[in-house]
A protein has these predicted regions:
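Methionine residue identity
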Residues: 1-3
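Long, contiguous binding/interaction regions
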Residues: 8-97
């Protein structure tokens, strides 16, 4: 299923209204880092900015993404990330489109 939602919008089916969202990601299993970075690269055109903070005392990394994308793309990205082992993700949306 990977990229199914992404391809729908990238291949220009129809213009969609975009939303600004912040996606918070907690990585507790570094073995998932390569796949996580691959997913983020795939959705790169929607990512406004990224901040990563390694927190060594707890052995986790916190990543915050700012995105501007259709809601289906944001949901797809968040879902793909959240299905990785040792990774959780949540999105918070702006009130306005």
């Amino acid at each position: 299923m990977r990229m199914a939602v992404f391809e729908l919008f990238v291949k220009g089916r129809q213009p969609m209204e975009t939303r600004i969202a912040a996606i918070s990601i907690i990585v507790s299993d570094r073995a998932s880092a390569e796949e996580l970075n691959s997913i983020l690269h795939t959705y790169g055109e929607y990512i406004i900015g990224r901040m990563g903070i390694p927190y060594k005392p707890k052995g986790v990394s916190v990543i915050c993404l700012a995105v501007d994308a259709p809601m289906d793309v944001i949901n797809g990205l968040t879902g793909e990330i959240g299905r990785l082992p040792g990774v959780s993700a949540k999105a918070a949306y702006s009130a306005k489109a």
